From Swiss-Prot:
It comes from the Bacteria. One of its GO terms (molecular function) is methionyl-tRNA formyltransferase activity. It comes from Escherichia coli (strain SE11). It catalyses: L-methionyl-tRNA(fMet) + (6R)-10-formyltetrahydrofolate = N-formyl-L-methionyl-tRNA(fMet) + (6S)-5,6,7,8-tetrahydrofolate + H(+). GO terms for cellular component: cytosol. Its EC number is 2.1.2.9. Attaches a formyl group to the free amino group of methionyl-tRNA(fMet). The formyl group appears to play a dual role in the initiator identity of N-formylmethionyl-tRNA by promoting its recognition by IF2 and preventing the misappropriation of this tRNA by the elongation apparatus. It holds the Pfam family Formyl_trans_N. NCBIfam families: fmt. (6S)-5,6,7,8-tetrahydrofolate binds at S113, L114, L115, P116. Keywords: Protein biosynthesis, Transferase. This is Methionyl-tRNA formyltransferase. The lineage of its organism: Bacteria, Pseudomonadati, Pseudomonadota, Gammaproteobacteria, Enterobacterales.
Length: 315
């Protein structure tokens, strides 16, 4: 194989852990792992380690969990490791310029989009919501900007009409490690060919909010159906009925024109709950009232038919 590189790995969630697992099987030397500090989780708010920390400790790797990499003593931790390259995957901390320049080959990042489209925090969700035909991963050389570095390698995959953010996440978690290992080989061999991003093609994937996931019936049925898939499994699209939030897990588009005001319930039957939108009809198929499990529209109608009387409006 190519030269074995000394690698610092920096990442936090499961998506990152899958990349670390691939690195550990690749023949490279992972000398240390950086991950976010343990966070309170679950009903008991017990401090929980990140998936990356769990895997690293299983493999006997040194783990560092700084709150920031700005303090000089934390930067010295990186410098002392004398790494060839630092691999960053969904780490969650900003890397100062000094840290970016410490490894011999710099720092590289696995980003969940085909850059320069969808720079930023939520590329998977934004690509789905926008109706993109494909997405993928980009391995890039990091610089001080937000996902602005030169591109080293790309892998793409189609976005299907059934994809949710959850299914796309899994697809990219398979592609990312493949692209990462290939890129490391090219860096080790000196065959990598950095490509500057075209600034005229840049779009930004802003962080998601729960309020943004509230269904806006003035949008088209097609937009709302994509929104429901984009926000599944988090933060989940939702509507409010009698002061209660109701999550929407699945819906379909009915290409029939209607003059009814957006949000008007047109039909409620075993085929679903049909609601007028700004353009077309959205058929709600799977919903989850507060404190309940997700259920079919038919099952919800059996217990809460009064919520979905045709002619009433959802807001």
């Amino acid at each position: 194989m190519s030269e074995s590189l000394r690698i610092i790995f920096a990442g936090t969630p499961d998506f990152a852990a899958r990349h670390l697992d691939a690195l550990l099987s690749s023949g490279h030397n992972v000398v240390s792992v950086f991950t976010q500090p343990d966070r309170p989780a679950g009903r008991g708010k017990k401090l929980m380690p990140s998936p990356v920390k769990v895997l690293a400790e299983e493999k006997g790797l040194p783990v560092f969990q700084p709150v920031s990499l700005r303090p000089q003593e934390n930067q010295q931790l990186v410098a002392d490791l004398q790494a060839d390259v630092m691999v960053v995957v969904a780490y969650g901390l900003i890397l100062p310029k000094a840290v970016l320049e410490m490894p011999r080959l710099g720092c590289i990042n696995v980003h969940g989009s085909l850059l320069p489209r969808w720079r930023g925090a939520a590329p998977i969700q934004r690509s789905l919501w926008a109706g993109d035909a494909e997405t993928g991963v980009t391995i890039m050389q990091m610089d001080v900007g937000l996902d602005t570095g030169d591109m080293l390698y790309k892998l793409s995959c189609p976005i299907t009409a059934e994809d949710t953010s959850g299914t796309l996440y899994d697809k990219l978690a398979e592609l990312g490690p493949q692209g990462l290992i290939t890129t490391l080989k090219q860096l080790a061999d000196g065959t990598a060919k950095p490509e500057v991003q075209d600034e005229t093609l840049v779009t930004y994937a802003e962080k998601l909010s729960k309020e943004e996931a509230r269904i806006d019936w003035s949008l088209s049925a097609a937009q709302l159906e994509r929104c429901i898939r984009a926000f599944n499994p988090w933060p989940m699209s939702w509507l409010e009925i009698e002061g209660q939030p109701v999550k929407v897990w699945k819906a379909s588009v009915i290409d029939t024109a209607t003059n009814a005001a957006p949000g008007t319930i047109l039909e409620a039957n075993k085929q679903g709950i049909q609601v007028a939108t700004g353009d077309g009809i959205l058929n709600l198929l799977s919903l989850q009232p507060a404190g309940k499990k997700a259920m079919s529209a038919q099952d919800l109608l059996n217990s809460r038919r009064e919520w979905f009387v045709p002619g009433n409006r959802l807001v």
